[in-house]
Design a protein with these regions (language model features):
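Active-site cofactor/cluster-binding pocket
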Residues: 1-159
Length: 159
């Protein structure tokens, strides 16, 4: 997503928190893609959040701006979001990826859902970024990733 934003000449920041959080906490990454200059990569409130598990929902649901967007995967959420002042979308990406025996494309299914409701960058930019960043030996996987993006666009549903 971030690389695709750069390819479209947008302002982009990418700030991961993948350290000790991976081992039992709420690993997260903040990506900002904007047509305007970004003053800080650190946010206290988010326009959009993609949430994949219950601990992350507990931590981040309250940090979405009123009128913002929350996308969640039904597989990892037992108690769905409760806020009424945000747009909530469910995408059953894990179930869909497993059903199609495409488990490694889970993230691309999620990305497809995001791009349907928030077309931050074009799908073509995503595919160009994959061609540019993936080693040549993995280029045969690009059509499967493109299919996963389309699946995500098809299965995301507003609640």
């Amino acid at each position: 997503l971030a690389y695709s934003g750069l390819m479209e000449n947008k302002e982009v920041t990418w700030m991961p928190a993948y350290g000790p959080e991976q081992r039992g906490g709420t690993a997260n990454v903040t990506v900002i893609v904007s047509d305007e200059r970004i003053s800080s990569p650190i946010l206290s409130k988010y326009d959009t959040a993609i949430i994949l598990n219950q601990p992350s929902l507990a931590k981040f649901e309250s940090k979405i701006k009123p009128g913002g967007t929350l996308i969640y995967d039904g597989y990892g959420i037992i108690n769905p979001p409760t806020r009424k002042d945000i747009h909530v979308y469910r995408i059953d990406a894990m179930d869909e990826a497993n059903e199609r025996k495409m488990a490694k494309t889970f993230n691309m299914i999620i990305l497809g859902g995001l791009l349907k409701i928030r077309p931050i960058v074009s799908t073509e930019s995503i595919l160009k970024a994959l061609r540019k960043t993936l080693p040549e030996r993995h280029h045969h996987l690009i059509p499967m990733n493109e299919e996963a993006i389309r699946i995500g666009m098809d299965i995301i549903k507003e609640e």
